[in-house]
Structure formats: C-alpha cells, structure tokens
Regions:
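Major-groove recognition helix of helix-turn-helix-like DNA-binding domains
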Residues: 86, 111-119
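Short Lys/Arg-enriched helix C-cap and helix-to-coil transition segments
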Residues: 124-131
C-alpha cells in the first residue's frame, strides 16, 4: 500500500496529512514537542488531500462543525473505542477523561483513556482537544496547550452555545 502525504497550513501551525487511496490515516502537528514529519517511502500528493484541506479551512473559519472525510485510524480495539467516543463529543463542548471512560463502559480506565487520547493519530478530526481534566483544566495535547486552547476558543465562538 502506498502511503500518501501532504501539508496543510492552519492558524495553529502546519499540519501533516497522511493517508492512502481510500482514507485519511493521520493528521499530525508538524511543529512543537511532538512534531511529525513525512516518513521514508511516503509519496507527496497534494491532489489527494484537497477535500480534507478545504474542510479544515472551513473549520478554522468557523464554517464547519463536522468533517465528511473517510478516516482509518490504526489502533487497538480499546483505542478505537476511545477514538469513537471522542468523535461523539459535540462541537463546542468538552468531556473529561472520566466521562469518556464511563461512556465506553470502563469507568476505572481513566489513565488508559488518557493514553489512547494521546495516541490519537487524527488530531482535530477525532477531537481529542475536547477532552479536559475533571477539574476543568487543560491537559496534554500533541499540538501544545496553546493550540488546544485556540481550538476550544474557536469552537466556543462558533458553537452558538453561549449566544
């Protein structure tokens, strides 16, 4: 299988997009402590990522609340259950790690939920930025806490929850 990639500019820095002919398999931050770059043997193909780039631009402009892109994250069954729960957090809202653990039917797995959240290969599209500490504090994020805060503020401004 050929791994394709492209970069997408965003207000929180450049994003690395990875996928194949059928689905997006990764969206990573290409700056910061956990920055990712293209792997050896990956093939650059900007044309294959036009749709997701357009949808990301709409998201950052406050015009899109859900993404319509085929996703294929690779992970364990537990990780994929956490990532599915993340996708169910409504735009503009947050949940705690405990909330997610309860949602997947394993309330004692708070730390494991945190680990799965940290290994989310599809940042923004699988909205791990919407997960916060039980006390309401911002916790780790691959793009850095400033980016997490920016994403939450963007969604808060455009969610209509406080209008």
């Amino acid at each position: 299988m050929t791994i394709l990639y492209s970069y997408c500019d965003s207000p929180i820095g450049p994003l690395l997009l990875r996928g194949d002919a059928t689905a997006l398999t990764g969206l990573y931050f290409s700056m910061g402590d956990k920055a990712r770059g293209a792997g050896a043997g990956w093939h650059r193909s900007d044309a294959d990522f036009v749709r997701v780039k357009r949808q990301l631009a709409e998201y950052f402009a406050g015009q899109r609340k859900q993404f319509e892109v085929a996703l294929a994250p690779q992970g364990t069954p537990f990780q994929t259950s956490v990532w599915q729960a993340l996708r169910e957090i409504p735009y503009g809202e947050t949940r705690s790690y405990l909330d997610i653990a309860r949602q997947i039917g394993n309330p004692k797995a708070v730390r494991a939920v945190g680990t799965a959240n940290a290994r989310n290969p599809l940042a923004i599209l699988v909205p791990c930025h919407r997960v916060i500490g039980s006390d309401g504090s911002l916790t780790g994020f691959a793009g850095g806490l400033a980016s997490k805060r920016a994403l939450l503020e963007l969604e808060s401004r455009h969610s209509g929850l406080w209008a």
